[in-house]
Amino acid sequence: MKFTRVCDRRDVPEGEALKVESGGTSVAIFNVDGELFATQDRCTHGDWSLSDGGYLEGDVVECSLHMGKFCVRTGKVKSPPPCEALKIFPIRIEDNDVLVDFEAGYLAP
């Protein structure tokens, strides 16, 4: 696995999201009760940013374009209109550095 430093942990306040990019891949980092999760940033239904204008409630993000919802832990659709899950990305914290493996995005089983 190839992890890339994307931000400082303090850059993502609890209940918020931050968009990060590497090699043309955009990932949203979500802070859920102090735990960080990484998913693709674009909604699978309307190609809309989930980190910019999306609404995070617990571990569910709502797309601001058509109100579809996804679980940020699993990437799974929680409410239509989307029918395709989000890719999730391996993430780890070292000290306060947030690292993401942009090459290992996957769909949860």
UniProtKB/Swiss-Prot annotation:
Q: Where does [2Fe-2S] cluster bind?
A: C43, H45, C63, H66
The protein's superkingdom reads Bacteria
Q: Name one GO biological process term.
A: catabolic process
Give the UniProt keywords, A-Z: 2Fe-2S, Aromatic hydrocarbons catabolism, Electron transport, Iron, Iron-sulfur, Metal-binding, Transport
Please name the PROSITE patterns in this protein's record: RIESKE
Q: Which InterPro entries match?
A: Rieske_2Fe-2S (IPR017941), Rieske_2Fe-2S_sf (IPR036922)
Q: Which GO terms describe its molecular function?
A: 2 iron, 2 sulfur cluster binding; metal ion binding
**What task does this protein carry out?**
This protein seems to be a 2Fe-2S ferredoxin.
Provide the protein name: Biphenyl dioxygenase system ferredoxin subunit
Species of provenance: Paraburkholderia xenovorans (strain LB400)
